[in-house]
């Protein structure tokens, strides 16, 4: 799993991660 020491680190990482996948994998998050 992920070892994230600070909440904001996860938030920023996920934000970038989501932005990269948004166009191609948007459906996975929307269901």
From Swiss-Prot:
Record keywords, A-Z: Iron, Metal-binding, Muscle protein, Oxygen transport, Transport
Sites where the protein binds Fe cation: 25
Tissue: Muscle.
SUPFAM superfamilies membership: Hemerythrin-like
Keyword Transport: yes
Molecular functions (GO terms): iron ion binding; oxygen carrier activity
Function: Myohemerythrin is an oxygen-binding protein found in the retractor muscles of certain worms. The oxygen-binding site contains two iron atoms.
Quaternary structure annotation from Swiss-Prot or TrEMBL: Monomer.
Name of the protein described by the UniProt record: Myohemerythrin-2
Species classification: Eukaryota, Metazoa, Spiralia, Lophotrochozoa, Annelida
